Amino acid sequence: MGSNLPYAADAESPLKPAELQVLRAQYEKEGDYVGIQTKFNFAWGLIKSNARPDQQEGVRLLSEIFRAAPERRRECLYYLALGNYKLGNYGEARRYNDLLLEKEPANLQAASLGTLIDERVSKEGLMGFAIVGGLALAAGLVGGMVFRGAKRR
């Protein structure tokens, strides 16, 4: 991540395993009666993780909070956007981030994450074009060799 995007530092800074374990222990301790704040804290820690299964679980927990607690939706939006960004779900990431920016146009963290999302989409889009172009070139070369070989017979 570039140093020109300090507000999106959450995108690449996981918690230490011991810190995540504290959040997990509290979440598991509360069991069936887990509080919204405990669930949010654990989801936040999971999303910051570099492990894809943790990120997926974090997005799932935040989605539950988003649906069940309308008063907490705004604070879920950024981390839903971040989690989806880290999972490569750029359309979902952009959707959540845009919702947050509609509510808070001056939110520098969301603006910074929006830039990261746009950069990743552009980069992967260019890679996709390069792959398709390379395949087309290879098919053309093979086709040319087959055609040339057929002409010689």
UniProtKB/Swiss-Prot annotation:
Gene3D superfamilies: Tetratricopeptide repeat domain. InterPro entries: Fis1, Fis1_cytosol, Fis1_TPR_C, Fis1_TPR_N, TPR-like_helical_dom_sf. Keywords: Membrane, Mitochondrion, Mitochondrion outer membrane, Repeat, TPR repeat, Transmembrane, Transmembrane helix. The lineage of its organism: Eukaryota, Fungi, Dikarya, Ascomycota, Pezizomycotina. It is a single-pass membrane protein. It is found in: Mitochondrion outer membrane. Belongs to the FIS1 family. This is Mitochondrial fission 1 protein. The keyword Hydrolase does not apply. It comes from Aspergillus oryzae (strain ATCC 42149 / RIB 40). GO terms for cellular component: mitochondrial outer membrane; peroxisomal membrane.
